[in-house]
Structures are given as structure tokens and as C-alpha cells.
Amino acid sequence: MKNWKTRTKLVHSGTKRSQFGELSEALFLTQGFAYDTAEQAESRFINNSPDEYIYGRYGNPTVRMFEERMIAIEGAEDAFATATGMAAVSGALFCMLKQGDHLISSKALFGSCMFVVDNILRRWGIEVTLVEGTDLNQWRDAMQPNTKVCFLESISNPTLEVCDIAGVAKIAHEGGAKLVVDNVFATPLFQQTLKLGADVVIYSATKHIDGQGRCLGGVVLGTEEYIQDVFIPFNKHTGPAMSPFNAWVMLKGLETISLRCEAQAENAEKIINALKGHKNITRILYPTDVSHPQYELAISQMTKGGTVVSFELSGGKKAAFSFLNALEIITISNNLGDAKSLATHPVTTTHKNMAAEAREAAGITDGFVRLSVGIEDPEDLIVDLLEALEKV
């Protein structure tokens, strides 16, 4: 199996068949498990093996198949699937931190991630320093003796900022800290975060892994020691486990993720070229486009630029709303990574609860639009975008 190519792993890794020989992965809709003897029950509670099941909050055969497929494509030692992407983010950070510890985070974060970092962690007595994620000197200067975790998104939501993962990992490790990376926008197909030096990688499986807007889910990947000894003891007692049904849907999503994301990335590149220079667009962002501020870094650590294009319209919120309301094919939605193309206005949706000054500093202006590119015909998408832009 270890010599399989990625697309083969996406279809076959982790699959275990029951005695019935089902072709599709079995869906184990059960909250608990029965034991042949009292001795077997005792043994399972002692061993606590990921392949021996005692309760749905701790593990499930369908969920484990999803975890093992993610392990194979990410190149991780172990993984644990969660109920949502934010459960993955929260659990990955909370299990490593206690009162008096220090966390360094990039300022460029999804709104809910920023709330966890800048609000919840501070309330729990954890020191937090926010830095410009693209500036290695700021990461280095922020390190303290009690720094336990460095946290970043690369690519960031929604400004598509690219951080030097290897550079931040080196700084973190020299100071005895761990690097946690939210890799949702880049996907495991276009950026192998653990190979770049990250200790823990997080995904909202809700996005590209499902890819069709059906289910919520998250997954945390890292070393066996971290997952088994640090993350799982915290997670199984706090409870945000993935449901077996959602895991089954995610397994089906993984079978086609490479086909979808390749098509989405190709569409994104065509859209960038079509929109460049448009009179109503003041700024357009895509990581592997030569105009991107971190272009050289992006092409050094990514194979493709992802599935999201962001741009700023002249005319602020009024222009952004006029543009969104004029779209016909592209749907207004705050989700991303879907087979359908989706557009949103971050200031009034995903980053609404972020302080206005922080939004402006991050480049999330009133005219800013995030476009999650789908798998539709690129010509149709470009026509839809250009026609909507003319109505701004």
C-alpha cells in the first residue's frame, strides 16, 4: 500500500470488509458494542486499541476507515475524526495548553478560529500573541519560555495569505513548541504540511473532503504519540466525535476529491486570468498567480494554488452586494470546497464578529469577496462573473 499513488490511496486506503464482502465500505450505525465475555470487555477497556471498539464516542469501524484513509494521503502516523472542523481546531489546541502557557498565532484566521484563539484561550488564562504570519521575524520575536504552540492557516481564510510552514516550524521547534497548521484551503492534495515540518495538521472535512455540502466533520492528524496520548484522552471525554454516517459520506467524498480539486484549481486559474485588470476589481488574490505577494513561497510548498479566488471590488459593500446579487450560476453561500461555485462577503458573514479594525488590518475590506470555485464549465463561470461585474 505504501507505494500506491495518491489517487489509488483515495479510493482504497483504509477499507476493511466484513464477513459479507460488501463492495462499498460498511456503515456501522451503532452507539455501542457487544462483548462475547466479561473478560473480553475487560480486555478492551485495558488495551484501548483503535481497532477494538467499546463506545461510539471513542471510536467506530466506519470512522476508523475514514481516519486511515486520511492517514494514508497525509503521510501521518495517526488521526482522529471529529464532529466538525472547529471541533478539530479547538481540540487540537486545547489538549496541548493549560493556564500559564503561551500560544503564538497568525493574525490571518477564519472568524471562528480567531474567536477560539483571541477570546476563549485568553479567558482560560492562556497567553496569546498575534503576529503577521508572513513575517518570520515576528514569530521569532514572539517566542517565550512558556510558548507551547504556534498556530497558523496556510492558505488563510479569506485573504489567501501563505505562511512559510518550514520556517515557522523551525522557530517553534527551536523554542520547544509544536506547530499546528490548518490546511483546509490548500488540501492534502496541494500541500503536504507534515512533510514541511508541522507537528499537527487540521482539516474541516466539511469542505473539500465531503465536497458536496452534505455533512459536517473534521480530522486531526499527527504522530501516534500525539493522537493517542494527548489528543484522544482530551477528545473522548469532551465528546466531539464524528458520526459514522458522516464518516461514510467523507469516505465517498475522498474517492473523488482529486478529480474535483484538480478541476477546481484549473477553473480558478482561468478565472484569475479572465478577471485580471477588470475596471471594477482593485485587488485579486490567488496563491500561485505571479501577482500574489507570496507567490515564490507558494510555488515552493504547494503543487497548485487551491480552489479559492478572492478579490476586492471598488465601491465597498454596496458594490459587493450588487455583484453577488447579480450572479446566476454561482451561489451565495459561506461554505467552500463544494462542487458548486460559491461566493460570500466575509465582512458580513464569516468574519462578521471580528473587530472592524482587525478586519481592515487583515485586508478584509467592505468590498472583499471570496469565491470558492466549483467544477462547472469555466467558460460559464467566467461569463457569470463578468456579467455580474458589469452590474456593479
Task: Please give the residue ranges for each predicted region.
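N-terminal "arm"/small-domain region of PLP-dependent enzymes with the aminotransferase-like
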Residues: 1-60, 68
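Conserved PLP-enzyme active-site core in the AAT-like
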Residues: 7-19, 79-280, 285
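Conserved small-domain helix->loop->beta segment predominantly found in fold-type I
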Residues: 269-338, 354-360
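Active-site beta-loop-alpha junctions enriched in small/polar residues
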Residues: 155, 184-186, 289, 314, ...
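Conserved N-terminal alpha-helix of the aminotransferase class I/II PLP-enzyme fold
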Residues: 37-87, 112-119
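PLP-dependent enzyme catalytic core of the Aspartate aminotransferase-like
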Residues: 118-119, 127-129, 141, 145, ...
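Short loop segments at secondary-structure junctions
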Residues: 32, 222-226, 254, 313-318
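Short, well-ordered beta-strand elements within core beta-sheets of diverse protein domains
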Residues: 250-259, 307-314, 370-374
